[in-house]
Curated annotation (Swiss-Prot):
Organism encoding this protein: Mus musculus
Family: Belongs to the histone deacetylase family.
Subunit structure: Interacts with HDAC6.
Lineage: superkingdom: Eukaryota
Residues annotated as catalytic: H143
Lineage: Eukaryota, Metazoa, Chordata, Craniata, Vertebrata
Pfam families: Hist_deacetyl
Biological process terms in GO annotation: chromatin organization
Name by which UniProt lists this protein: Histone deacetylase 11
Length: 347
């Protein structure tokens, strides 16, 4: 019997399946500026969407913090106890001065925002199944597994969202993860190693962190990119492999890890995708998945430049303008849309 949770409560129809909380953003005495990650990007995305009149506060779903019981669905108690040591959190977040902070401050100022984003991903999973789509304007902590964190990822939100669906939602027994962050998603790969219910497609720069050879064994469709890969090659590989993934394993839900660290100039991602290329990438994924009438959950994952918030907002606006998301969502396929994809042929 699943435990009682606050994350699977009813959401009124008037609210769009876009999940966010002001508590996502990490701010504490400027320490967040010591990491290249823009630790306030999530709020900036929402502000841009409000400025464009797409959303108001009353249309958003307020994320709730994942409880310890929620986290124990995936995480070991030993790992959660390790997070009570500031030096462990400093290592995971890659912000060395965190080691000198009392852990109660680390819990409140660093881990609580990450737990709230994790709760948001779990909530968005249920919403995606109910509404056909959902976006958590946060989450995507794809380097964290049940018993280890790293790369700014302290909680395994993708694994948690899928396991919650498997345990609590009738008819959800197969999932596909489409991970398009610039880095290999070794966390969910370790968690779902050997689990035939979960198909993982991962497109990443082969030369950068984490280089987890063991975790790569869980990838069913692996696309390794070279330094400086640009739009044309990238978009062709993404579309072709998304199509093939859905042919090989037709899931009940897709979790799309939409990292923007593929952006040109991102010194950690090492790829050269333009802002327009990222917007097109997200469009391609949504259109192909929705053409199969499969629910899709998008999380925003990595992105290490100040302009990534604007790009994420532009992508969400584009999905709305094309009718791929909205309050009354129509299933739009490449065939009945006036806006072409890349070539639909699969060689």
């Amino acid at each position: 019997m699943p435990h009682a949770t606050q994350l699977y409560q009813h959401v009124p129809e008037k609210r769009w399946p876009i999940v966010y909380s002001p508590r996502y953003n990490i701010t504490f005495m400027g320490l967040e500026k010591l990491h290249p990650f823009d630790a306030g990007k999530w709020g900036k995305v929402i502000n841009f969407l409000k400025e464009e009149k797409l959303l108001s506060d009353g249309m958003l779903v307020e994320a709730r913090e994942a409880s310890e019981e929620d986290l124990l669905v995936v995480h070991t108690r030993r790992y959660l106890n390790e997070l009570k040591w500031s030096f462990v959190v400093a290592t995971i977040t890659e912000i060395p001065p965190v080691i000198f902070l009392p852990n109660f401050l680390v819990q409140r100022k660093v881990l609580r925002p990450l737990r709230t984003q994790t709760g948001g991903t779990i909530m968005a999973g249920k919403l995606a199944v109910e509404r056909g789509w959902a976006i958590n304007v946060g989450g995507g902590f794809h380097h964290c597994s049940s018993d280890r964190g790293g790369g700014f990822c302290a909680y395994a939100d993708i694994t948690l969202a899928i396991k919650f669906l498997f345990e609590r939602v009738e008819g959800i027994s197969r999932a596909t993860i489409i991970d398009l962050d610039a880095h290999q998603g070794n966390g969910h790969e370790r968690d779902f190693m050997g689990d035939k219910r979960v198909y993982i497609m991962d497109v990443y720069n082969r030369h950068i962190y984490p280089g987890d050879r063991f975790a790569k064994e869980a990838i069913r469709r692996k696309v390794e990119l070279e330094w400086g890969t640009e739009d044309e090659e990238y978009l062709e590989k993404v579309e072709r492999n998304v199509r093939r993934s859905l042919q090989e394993h037709l899931p009940d839900v897709v979790v799309y890890n939409a990292g923007t660290d593929v952006l040109e100039g991102d010194r950690l991602g090492g790829l050269s995708i333009s802002p327009a290329g990222i917007v097109k990438r997200d469009e391609v994924v949504f259109r192909v998945v929705r053409a199969h009438d499969i629910p899709i959950l998008m999380v925003t994952s990595g992105g290490y430049q100040k302009r990534t918030a604007r790009i994420i907002a532009d992508s969400i606006l584009n999905l709305h303008d094309l009718g791929l998301i909205g309050p009354e969502f129509p299933c739009v396929s490449a065939q009945n849309s006036g806006i072409p994809l890349l070539s639909c042929a699969v060689p």
